[in-house]
Amino acid sequence: MDFSRLHMYSPPQCVPENTGYTYALSSSYSSDALDFETEHKLDPVFDSPRMSRRSLRLATTACTLGDGEAVGADSGTSSAVSLKNRAARTTKQRRSTNKSAFSINHVSRQVTSSGVSHGGTVSLQDAVTRRPPVLDESWIREQTTVDHFWGLDDDGDLKGGNKAAIQGNGDVGAAAATAHNGFSCSNCSMLSERKDVLTAHPAAPGPVSRVYSRDRNQKCYFLLQILRRIGAVGQAVSRTAWSALWLAVVAPGKAASGVFWWLGIGWYQFVTLISWLNVFLLTRCLRNICKFLVLLIPLFLLLAGLSLRGQGNFFSFLPVLNWASMHRTQRVDDPQDVFKPTTSRLKQPLQGDSEAFPWHWMSGVEQQVASLSGQCHHHGENLRELTTLLQKLQARVDQMEGGAAGPSASVRDAVGQPPRETDFMAFHQEHEVRMSHLEDILGKLREKSEAIQKELEQTKQKTISAVGEQLLPTVEHLQLELDQLKSELSSWRHVKTGCETVDAVQERVDVQVREMVKLLFSEDQQGGSLEQLLQRFSSQFVSKGDLQTMLRDLQLQILRNVTHHVSVTKQLPTSEAVVSAVSEAGASGITEAQARAIVNSALKLYSQDKTGMVDFALESGGGSILSTRCSETYETKTALMSLFGIPLWYFSQSPRVVIQPDIYPGNCWAFKGSQGYLVVRLSMMIHPAAFTLEHIPKTLSPTGNISSAPKDFAVYGLENEYQEEGQLLGQFTYDQDGESLQMFQALKRPDDTAFQIVELRIFSNWGHPEYTCLYRFRVHGEPVK
């Protein structure tokens, strides 16, 4: 079908139903033309407002309103695709048309109302001419329907809403139609004076009223349209949900990513909003609120102070009522004119614009005014009474003075001149009374002081007599004791003389003993001295301590020789071996039995941890190492375990080796350098008596020397593990050329303090530059009871 003739089409001017729109063959109301434009992607032929089917129905209804009939038909018989496209286009244009109609509707309503109130139609004509020439009667009908649907009319006036003010000859309708459409049809020209004019104005001005169509069926139609739109929206939502579910089933990864993307956007917007609110509240609102509170707090305090002063005083500060105008000045001379409020005025409500004033507040003000008026009336009555009393007083004064002066002058003199002489006499008498009263008080005080002095003297005499009586027997007792001391002293003198005689006897005995010793031991040397005798005894005899030391050394030497024999021969020592060990030890001239006894004692000592004393630092006995206060362990570079040439475990010993009994070469604790620390917790609290430091002998060393052995060391006693500097128990030196096990005696202390933590501090070694080795450290002493 060819639609090219649409471009040359001109709308008819006399069609009764023509409203100025080119909808007969345009794409807005022809499905064939719409399909043609959609197929060839052409723009609409006429760029004019497009009316919906609802507007056409409204136009038809408005034209037939004079006959009293409403005709509405829905002629939707197009295909589904054309309906959707046409609905989309008409919806957009209907929105723009409704907006313009809504704005123009307000202008026309204002102009019409002003024209009716003044009784003319000039404003109506101006409003009509202001409307765009593109709009026609359909615009009026659409406007009426829109106003009725959105509630722009006065819905309360239901009767007036259905009325139409039309002149008998229909001039208004014709003129309005001509003014709106720009042309006049044949039907409308019958009611007008001019028939062949395209643009006509009303012949005679007159009051014009708008025509409203309030058909109740339109509400049902609009409700149906709303339900249809809601259904379409629900269908779209369900379709979207179904597509989302289908996407989740078909491509769950994409759906999940989309969901997370939307959630991320929502969460980002939410966090942004919260941060913005936080910044806004803290930086702007908080500061403004603080300023507002700073300004508001003094106002609250002022209002509180005013309210505390009284409700009446508070209302007196309000500028609503001028209380100063209600009061007038009172005169004492005219007490009859006291203020009497007229309650009739207060009880009358305000007229006109003052009806909005709060009447309940005015009632409270009236009550306060009434109470104030009552008080003023009461004060007026009191003033009247005072005035009458003053007049009576003036009359009496006039009678007493005989009329010499006026009443006012006599009263003024009586009030203004005080009786000075009378006051002076009264003051003098009062002064004399006070002086006499003070004299009486002084006399009483004097009497009391004399009585107190007498009592003190009596008490003093009584005290002296009582003390004298008590001291007499005490003095007598002391005299007796003094006599006894004198007698004892005399007896002690005799004892002293006896002691002197005893000393003399002892000296005599010593002299005699010396002489006898000389006679016994130095017969050949009669002239020898006692010192020579002592030197002789010391050369032939030894002391007990030296003997014990020599025996201990002998046992150790024998034990070392026996141990060496056992380690070499791998057999038990025979008698010949024991004798040779004893002879090597330097003990010659002894029998085999004596040698066996010495060996047995040496073996017994060896079985007793080589010392025969309890080791309180032994780990198996309860001792332990405080590793947190020990020096750093020296790590050897020899790997005990490796994988593909990669060392996995290096050999190293912990400080626990020092308090364990196993001693063999290499089984020691080594620390870096020549200075180190070792802290040992003993098994119990003891009084330290001796310390033993053991190292391997040179004969067992692979290098033949023991340069890694400690040299100078000291032992300290600690009260707790957190004490930095303890009490010195002894400072010693280990001899590398001496025995492998060397014992050192602790220093004697006067307080004899007990300790459970001992610190071994090494100051130097015997020359090794890299490390120092400790094999065994023992602590001996007496446990605390």
Curated annotation (Swiss-Prot):
One of its GO terms (molecular function) is identical protein binding. Residues 1-138 are annotated as: LMNA-binding. It is found in: Nucleus inner membrane. One of its GO terms (biological process) is centrosome localization. The modification Phosphoserine is found at S48, S100, S138, S344. Keywords: Coiled coil, Differentiation, Disulfide bond, Isopeptide bond, Meiosis, Membrane, Nucleus, Phosphoprotein, Signal-anchor, Spermatogenesis, Transmembrane, Transmembrane helix, Ubl conjugation. The disulfide bond with KASH domain-containing nesprins is required for stability of the respective LINC complexes under tensile forces. Residues 428-495 form a coiled coil. Its main location: nucleus. Residues 1-288 are nuclear. There is a cross-link at K195 (Glycyl lysine isopeptide (Lys-Gly) (interchain with G-Cter in SUMO2)). The chain crosses the membrane at residues 289-308. InterPro entries: SUN1-5 (IPR045119), SUN1_N (IPR032680), Sun_CC2 (IPR040994), SUN_dom (IPR012919). Residues 574-785 are annotated as: Sufficient for interaction with SYNE1 and SYNE2. Residues 309-785 are perinuclear space. Residues 622-784 form the SUN domain. It is a single-pass type II membrane protein. GO terms for cellular component: chromosome, telomeric region; cytoplasm; intracellular membrane-bounded organelle; meiotic nuclear membrane microtubule tethering complex; nuclear envelope; nuclear inner membrane; nuclear membrane. Core component of the LINC complex which is composed of inner nuclear membrane SUN domain-containing proteins coupled to outer nuclear membrane KASH domain-containing nesprins. SUN and KASH domain-containing proteins seem to bind each other promiscuously; however, differentially expression of LINC complex constituents is giving rise to specific assemblies. At least SUN1/2-containing core LINC complexes are proposed to be hexameric composed of three protomers of each KASH and SUN domain-containing protein. As a component of the LINC (LInker of Nucleoskeleton and Cytoskeleton) complex involved in the connection between the nuclear lamina and the cytoskeleton. The nucleocytoplasmic interactions established by the LINC complex play an important role in the transmission of mechanical forces across the nuclear envelope and in nuclear movement and positioning. Required for interkinetic nuclear migration (INM) and essential for nucleokinesis and centrosome-nucleus coupling during radial neuronal migration in the cerebral cortex and during glial migration. The coiled coil domains differentially mediate trimerization required for binding to nesprins and are proposed to dynamically regulate the oligomeric state by locking the SUN domain in an inactive confirmation. The coiled coil domains are proposed to be involved in load-bearing and force transmission from the cytoskeleton. This is SUN domain-containing protein 1. It comes from Homo sapiens (Human).
